[in-house]
Design a protein with these regions (language model features):
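Structured, solvent-exposed acidic/aromatic patches
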Residues: 1-123
Length: 123
C-alpha cells in the first residue's frame, strides 16, 4: 500500500497514484506514530478520547505483531511488556463476568479502554 504522509495537492499522476511503499517502512511509521501518541496523549479517564491505556494497548498489540510476524526480536517483547505493565497499574482490568462487559447498565466499565459514542439521533 502507498503510505502518504503529506497532502496531495496536484493532479500529477505520480502524486495521485503513488507506488507501493515497502512493508518495512509502513511498519516503522506505525511504530513512530504510536510513540508520538504516547508523547502527546494526556492522562485522564474519559473513554471517548484517546487515553494512555488505549495507546499502550495499541503499543502492546503492535509490538507483539512485530515480534510474531516480522521477526522483530526480543526488543519487541520487551516493548509489549512495558506497555502492558503501564496498563496494569491503571484502573483498567478484566471483569469477572464476561457477559457484564456488554450489559446496558454497565457501559464504559473497567474493561473498556476506548469507546465511541454511537448517538443514533445525532446528525
Amino acid at each position: 500500500m502507498p503510505l502518504l504522509l503529506n497532502p496531495v495537492e496536484s493532479v500529477d499522476a505520480e502524486e495521485c497514484y503513488p507506488a507501493r511503499s515497502p512493508k518495512a517502512y509502513v511498519y516503522e511509521q506505525i511504530g513512530r506514530d504510536i510513540e508520538t501518541a504516547v508523547a502527546y496523549v494526556t492522562s485522564g479517564t474519559d473513554k471517548y478520547v484517546a487515553t494512555p491505556d488505549a495507546v499502550n494497548m495499541l503499543k502492546a498489540e503492535y509490538a507483539l505483531w512485530m515480534y510474531a510476524t516480522q521477526a522483530g526480536g526480543d526488543d519487541y517483547l520487551a516493548l509489549a511488556d512495558e506497555a502492558l505493565k503501564a496498563i496494569g497499574i491503571s484502573s483498567a482490568r478484566l471483569l469477572d463476568d464476561y457477559a457484564s462487559i456488554f450489559a446496558v447498565d454497565n457501559k464504559c466499565n473497567a474493561e473498556v479502554i476506548f469507546a465511541l459514542n454511537n448517538n443514533q439521533t445525532e446528525k
